[in-house]
Amino acid sequence: LSPGVISIENDQPIINTQPIQVGAAIIGPTVKGPVEIPSICTSYSDYVSKYGNTFTSGSQIYSYFTSISAYNYFQAGGTTLLVSRVTSGSFTTATSTNLPNSVESGVISTETNNILSSLTGVTGSAATYVISSSATSGVGIGFTGSIILSDGTTVSSITTTSGGSGYGIGDTITINSGSLGYSGGTIGSNTIITLDASNIVNNNAFTLETLSEGEIMNSISNRSTDGSLPSGSIDNLRWEIQSPDINEGTFSLLIRRGNDDTESPIILETFNNLSLDPTSPNYIEKVIGNQVQTINTTESEFYVDLTGNYANQSQYVRVKSVATPTYEYLDNTGDPKTGFTGSIPIASTGSFEGATGTNIPGPSAGAGKYYETINNTNNTQGLVSSDYTTAITLLANKEEFRYSYITVPGLIKDFATHTSNISSLMANSQQRGDTLAIIDLEDYQSTLLEVTNEAKTINNSYVAAYWPWVQTLDPSTGQQVFVPASTLIPSVFAFNDAAAEVWFAPAGTARGGMPTVLRAERKLTKTNRDDLYKANVNPITTFNTTGITVFGQKTLKKKKSATDRINVRRLLIELKIQIGNLAENLVFEQNT
């Protein structure tokens, strides 16, 4: 070819990352998890890992509507679920028990019977005695505890209630012979406690904090002979330090399930080659994370406030604090600095403690109301309506949370104490303009007239209602239970969206089937269905050939229009989202 310049146009479109758009959002109580901080689940096993599935109340095992809904949603093809946990009262996280390094703290261990092997010369009368020690030499605070003598020379238990301070290996504690209530006029010898390394608590290297809140996260208890924790459960955690290396300043951290044991450890997460050196790429806060999410309620629009420099990479814990950071652990020759080697955690295992909060009503509050027994007496699954308020307000934040439809199974529009929150949910959906609220109008065993009358009080094309209640199999307990329709409608939408598109009607025998429903509360006649549809309530119908089926797709808009149909409303929502996302890229660009 002859010399010249060839001009070639290479069109590379700009692709911008958009906020995560999830399918369904659900607000309700769960067994565990962060309180009111929405979290995305991508499978039912992911949901159970974060939020649990069953709980015990009054010796009975239950599941929340939230868990039943999540199970059915993912079974039907749902891929993303935004969960917001609501609770009753104050909830806090659990923190790790002492995570020791090799530096002694001078405090005696408070673990039951820890100093039992250090006792000598015990004589006295069988009884329980309080021990109060005051130091006669050295500095520090004397320990206190209790000792139980089962006979004149046998100690069945000794407990340290306060570990004091200033103790070291080889120090002795004397319990005066006259303090143990000797009988028969016989005075025994003094009881001597000679402290060894196992009796003295080492300093804490760092502290972990659970992401989940509530007393269910407390696993602290004395280890059994097989290494199990009596308070350990499938829902809480324990920790283990392995492979500490003082030459490199590294160690491994295992997060284990609370109900495992030494022979069969159930390891949930493993973090290898961690460091306490903030300059290291494996610094523990960088690898695990240290961020805390709180809800800011000081303004009319609630939002999630984030503190901490490192995003949480663990699904279960964050680093609350590092007691002794080891800045530049190695010196210029590659050797560990002498002052830092004692800061590395030693091989050990422990549990979590200090969490507070439960949704299980106490004896004075009476038993919680679950499944079809929920009523208007201000007790729905152990909660009251006001417990939902913050979560509902937060999820009105369109900029932070994107979802296609939202439910609050357990809140009933007709319940006087629930009306305000249901009204807020409906108003939020309309104001956002990008989501559909699925609500329940009446409680179990309501009449058709009550349902239609309640529906007529609503005029909103961003809201849909279904009736009647349905019976399904609780996947976690095996019980056949009645649930409000909003518990299972997300699964119908999920199947519709997986099999077709959002602008197809999520109804009828092709896309409105409810295969996990055993029966509807009531078998609707053609006249019943007509009456419901006139009131814009979508009937859940029982057909002899196809089973339980959603046989309606109306919104609760009174005036006849295109948006009184769910598929049209969802189509317009989808169009607004897509056009809005594209238009954002054109703001401040040349448009003339």
Predicted features, each with a name:
Residues 95-105, 144-148, 192-194, 219-220, ...:
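Short amphipathic beta-strand/extended segments with alternating polar/hydrophobic composition
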Residues 16-17, 71-72, 104-123, 165-166, ...:
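Short linear motifs in intrinsically disordered
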Residues 127, 167-178, 230, 237, ...:
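Extended Gly/Ser/Thr-rich low-complexity repeat segments
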Residues 2, 7-10, 55, 96, ...:
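Charged, amphipathic alpha-helical segments
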Residues 106-199, 232:
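Conserved, function-critical positions that sit in or immediately flank catalytic
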Residues 177, 210, 410:
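Residues on the solvent-exposed faces and adjacent turns
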Residues 1-100, 125, 203, 244-262, ...:
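Structured, hydrophobic secondary-structure cores that serve as assembly/anchoring elements
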Residues 68, 139-148, 191-194, 201, ...:
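Short small/polar-residue motifs
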